[in-house]
């Protein structure tokens, strides 16, 4: 297993500077990570710097609340892809899920999948805000909507991935949909737990530390 190719090297803090973006790009090239995951404002720059490197550009949509309208999420997706994004990590309408408005949740995801035009879509369900049954339902809706991954967390809601949630999500979606674990994956031990639970992608700012087997000091 090439551990580096499971990692989306992530920097989503609102105060991220161009210098910090340069650093994660350089690290992603050095370690040959799967992608860098950055906010939409940095996508075009990252895509230019990563051209022909083999490292993909991932960005976030409706982030971190998931509470923007479906049309807004679809436009954000189209704009991101136009700017060079390869992969889209969207946040579901969490309130709609909790209301039981499952059609709204699924249609929201479907609109992003359609706007992504074949690009990989990962669906953040924010597990820390959900109970067991809601995690199952959100995972089912992600699969039904045609997305490629179901993802645990934004890292902005006070909690991140757990191996238990990753396993539950993987058991729910089966072989057709992959699972991304993100939020609080800070070292090689955390990384291995998530992979053993069924994750095939890891979102972390600690990619370098994971590869070096070191503890990181960041929550995302």
From Swiss-Prot:
Transmembrane segments: none annotated. Disulfide bonds: none annotated. The keyword Chloroplast does not apply. GO terms for biological process: 2-deoxyribose 1-phosphate catabolic process; carbohydrate catabolic process; deoxyribonucleotide catabolic process. It catalyses: 2-deoxy-D-ribose 5-phosphate = D-glyceraldehyde 3-phosphate + acetaldehyde. GO terms for molecular function: deoxyribose-phosphate aldolase activity. Keywords: Cytoplasm, Lyase, Schiff base. Belongs to the DeoC/FbaB aldolase family. DeoC type 1 subfamily. This is Deoxyribose-phosphate aldolase 2. It comes from Staphylococcus aureus (strain MRSA252). The gene is deoC2.
């Amino acid at each position: 297993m090439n551990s580096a190719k499971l990692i989306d090297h992530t920097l989503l803090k609102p105060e991220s500077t161009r210098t910090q973006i340069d650093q994660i790009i350089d690290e992603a090239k050095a370690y040959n990570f799967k992608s860098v995951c950055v906010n939409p404002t940095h996508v075009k720059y990252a895509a230019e710097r990563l051209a022909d490197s083999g490292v993909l550009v991932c960005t976030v949509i409706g982030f971190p609340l998931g509470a923007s309208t479906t049309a807004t999420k679809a436009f954000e997706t189209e704009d991101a892809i136009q700017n060079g994004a390869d992969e889209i990590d969207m946040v579901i309408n969490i309130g709609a899920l909790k209301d039981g408005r499952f059609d709204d949740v699924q249609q929201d995801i479907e609109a992003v999948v359609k706007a992504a035009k074949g690009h990989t879509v990962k669906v953040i369900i924010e597990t820390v805000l959900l109970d067991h049954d809601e995690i199952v339902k959100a995972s089912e809706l992600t699969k039904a909507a045609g997305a490629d991954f179901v993802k645990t967390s934004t890292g902005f809601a006070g909690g991140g991935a757990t191996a238990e949630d990753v396993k539950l999500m993987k058991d729910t979606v089966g072989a057709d949909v992959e699972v991304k674990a993100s939020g609080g994956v800070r070292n090689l031990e955390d990384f291995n737990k998530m992979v053993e639970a069924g994750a095939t992608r890891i979102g972390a700012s600690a990619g370098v530390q994971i590869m070096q087997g070191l503890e990181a000091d960041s929550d995302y």
